Structure formats: C-alpha cells, structure tokens
C-alpha cells in the first residue's frame, strides 16, 4: 500500500467554539482506496479573524507530506515520523506548531492501518484495557459568585453523572508568573469549602491555574487548599522550568499535573524523572501523535504516574485520545470538552454518558465524518 495524496479541509466550528473557531482536518489517501483521517490542532484559533490566518499551517502540512509522506507505506509510521521529526531546520527539537503537524499526520496513518486491519487502533497497541473511560467536566461559569453557588454547580455536575471536575480559581489568565494575594487564596479556599460541603467526597475537584503562578505563590495556594483534598494541582507554575515545578511538588501532598504544552517523550521524561508531576496531561494532537503518546504513557507507568490526557481540540483528535486511553493501563481520567459540532460531525457520535466515554469498536479511529455536516461548515 502506498500513500498517494493528502488533502486538507478547514471547517468552521459552532459557538461557543469549544476546541477553537476552526477545525483543520487531513485526509490521507492511498492507492488501495483507504483514507485516513487526521486533525491539526489549531490552538487559539478562537482569536482568528478568518480561516486565512491558518494558511501557514496548511502549507506546512502539505510541505511535510510532500517531503516525507506521499509515496510511503502508511504502515511505516515510526519511519515516517522519525524522518519528519529529524529533518527540518529545528532538527529534533521541534516547536508545538510543528509537532501538531506531525501528530495530525501520524493519527491519519494509524486510521489507515486500523482500517486495513479491520481493527480499532487500541487493538493494535496492546488491546483494550478499559471498557469505559472516566471523564471529567470543566466547571461552568458562575462558581466564583459565592461558595454556595460553587457548591450548587458542583452538585448539579454530580447529579448529571460526573465524578470529577476542574476549575481555575484565579482567572483571568496572566501573561507571566504572578503573586497570588492572601485575599485571593482565601476566596479560593472558600470556593473549595463550598464545593466540599455540597458534594462531600463523592466528586474529585482539580485545580487548573494555567501555569500563571510564581513558585512561592503556588506553594502557598497548595498549602491553603490541601485540606479540601483536590484531585490535582495543574500547571502550578509554567512548564518551562521543570525544577521549579518539582519544588512545588515537594512541598505539597496534592498531586501535580502537567503536560498540555509539552511535546515528545523527551520533554515528558524530564518532568516525570524529576518528580515534577505524577499526573501526565499529554495532548495526543500536539505531543507527537498516538504512538508518541503511548511511549510517554509507558515512561509514566515506570514511575507509577497516571495519564489524564488534555482534550481541547476538534473531534478527530478527541477520537485519537480515546484510542490511547483505552489501551493504556495507567489511564486515570479524560478531559471531556465537546461543543455542538463535536456531537453532529460524525455519522455515529462519540458516546459520552454518565461521566464516562464508551470507546468505539469500529476500525481505525472508529469514526466517519458526516460529509453533509462537514460541507455545511466547510470554508476551504
């Protein structure tokens, strides 16, 4: 089997634009008629004025495919990945921008391989470990109004079947590490107290701060919130300095989580080996793809760390994350962010029910685009 062509599609998302304002899909075609589906994570595309802002991303996909993909056997995933990873000007030290291109291509290749074998991808990577995947919700707006309101929202999520959620007690996002005042820490503690009073120990609650705290502020926050038994403390400091994150981890019993901004097994290995985090939030669409994610999960497994993949993306990469989760023994929980288009763009939607995701059983990614829906949103 040979890869003959790669086509891209830009699809406009629907409000509230979960995963970005636009989705960038790939179709990898073969001489045997099998087509693999991939997706290039577009990052902060909700800030884009139009799809034309992504022309450079589209060009990079086609440039990479012309050089390393077209004419190759789609089963040679490792070879294709290594050649593309090591042959650009940023030789073996790529940016998040380029690893998301590698991820998009790699996911499409796995979709082809799974379809050719008539097996879901997870069956080709060790087989199904989990029949269902625990998922968590991002707490809706309004939780900062009062501790009582935070408790009401958490209780509603619990009654909907969710066993875990996440919130950022220190918005808005700040461009650099900042001090958190004692007043802000106290307000956050009251929010967590309100949640615990409402749901008891029936729901896990994660702290997500987007890496915007100084080291000492992160330690103060952790000490103040420990009594409420948070699920994790996500990116307490920026992932740029692994040693500082490890210092936070050493000063708290709250598990530290990180990974959505890290790429390849090399960056993750340092975080894991230095004890900077014990919950690894890799992003399949950005870290290098499904096989690279499986390698990262294996490194984490050797240190008794768990994976809780990041999912702020379009529906194709969400499907790829589900394939990884299903075959990973150290899977903990999956972020579950879905907008209206995620639920209608496939002929058979991904199944999210009662706080769990049910892995698809079809070949490859187990999904098929509904082209009527795609064409209604197609912009390029």
Summary of predicted features, one role per range:
Residues 1-37, 41-48, 339-343:
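Structured beta-strand/loop patches that form or line metal/cofactor-binding pockets in enzymes
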Residues 3, 33, 65, 105, ...:
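Conserved, mostly hydrophobic/aromatic
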Residues 29, 63, 93, 223, ...:
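Shared catalytic-loop signature of beta/alpha-barrel
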Residues 29-116:
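Metal- or metallocofactor-binding catalytic centers and their adjacent structured scaffolds
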Residues 96, 106-143:
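Glycine-rich, aromatic-flanked loop segments that form ligand/cofactor-binding clefts
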Residues 102, 184, 207-214, 234-237, ...:
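Glycine- and other small-residue-rich loops at beta-strand/loop junctions that grip anionic moieties
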Residues 132, 136, 140-251:
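Metal-dependent enolase-superfamily TIM-barrel catalytic cores that perform enediolate-based chemistry
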Residues 340, 345-380:
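C-terminal extensions of enzymes
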